């Protein structure tokens, strides 16, 4: 009974329907353009691959590096801190100051495989998680060199872009929660 009393065709004549379609299309386009800056990819800085070369990681690579870091490293390095030794962190100045410097992807990969003290004098193979002690640190067992590069890239990009990354307990980490 209602369908006979109300005719959609009569209410919206073809010209009105076209106008409605154009209006909806304009609203959808305007809505989409308004959201474009919100969903735009962040600017990812290049980081050092080696002392003489640089590399820029993709969002997908950084996402995988973050996942691997959170699985294998974040137990002791939450937010770039170093809980066993809070005087040395993963902030760029600390990575640059190590001997040898750990301020590039390949140097961090080498450190993960063969950790040494900050001054480079003593081996930490028996103490620091590494790819050789896989029975003690099973989370490192299946990491490939490519995985290690993604972890290193994630660390270096965070050190360059995240306020408070690698800060000590006395420094503010109020902005870090968005990045973890």
Curated annotation (Swiss-Prot):
Names of the cofactor(s): heme c
Protein's membrane topology: Peripheral membrane protein
Biological processes annotated in GO: photosynthesis, light reaction
GO terms for MF: electron transfer activity; heme binding; metal ion binding
Keyword terms: Electron transport, Heme, Iron, Membrane, Metal-binding, Photosynthesis, Photosystem II, Signal, Thylakoid, Transport
Positions of heme c binding: 73, 76-77, 128
Pfam families: Cytochrom_C550 (PF14495)
One GO CC term, this protein: plasma membrane-derived thylakoid membrane
Xref: PROSITE patterns: CYTC
Residues making up the signal peptide according to the UniProt record: 1-40
Chain's role: One of the extrinsic, lumenal subunits of photosystem II (PSII). PSII is a light-driven water plastoquinone oxidoreductase, using light energy to abstract electrons from H(2)O, generating a proton gradient subsequently used for ATP formation. The extrinsic proteins stabilize the structure of photosystem II oxygen-evolving complex (OEC), the ion environment of oxygen evolution and protect the OEC against heat-induced inactivation. Low-potential cytochrome c that plays a role in the OEC of PSII.
Name of the protein this chain belongs to: Photosystem II extrinsic protein V
Organism phylogeny: Bacteria, Bacillati, Cyanobacteriota, Cyanophyceae, Synechococcales
């Amino acid at each position: 009974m209602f369908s006979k009393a109300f005719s959609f065709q009569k209410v919206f004549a073809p010209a009105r329907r076209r106008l409605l379609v154009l209006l909806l299309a304009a609203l959808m386009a305007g809505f989409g353009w308004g959201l474009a800056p919100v969903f735009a990819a962040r600017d990812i800085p290049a980081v050092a691959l080696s002392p003489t070369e640089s590399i820029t990681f993709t969002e997908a690579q950084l996402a995988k590096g973050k996942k691997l870091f959170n699985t294998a490293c974040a137990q002791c390095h939450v937010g770039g801190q170093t809980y066993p030794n809070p005087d040395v962190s993963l902030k760029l100045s600390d990575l640059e100051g190590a001997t040898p410097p750990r301020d590039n992807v390949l140097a961090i990969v080498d450190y993960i495989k063969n950790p040494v003290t900050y001054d480079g004098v003593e081996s930490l193979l028996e103490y620091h998680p590494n790819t050789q002690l896989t029975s003690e640190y099973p989370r490192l067992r299946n990491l490939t060199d490519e995985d290690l590069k993604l972890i290193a890239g994630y660390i270096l990009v965070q050190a360059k872009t995240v306020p408070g990354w690698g800060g000590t307990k006395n420094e503010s980490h109020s902005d870090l929660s968005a990045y973890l």
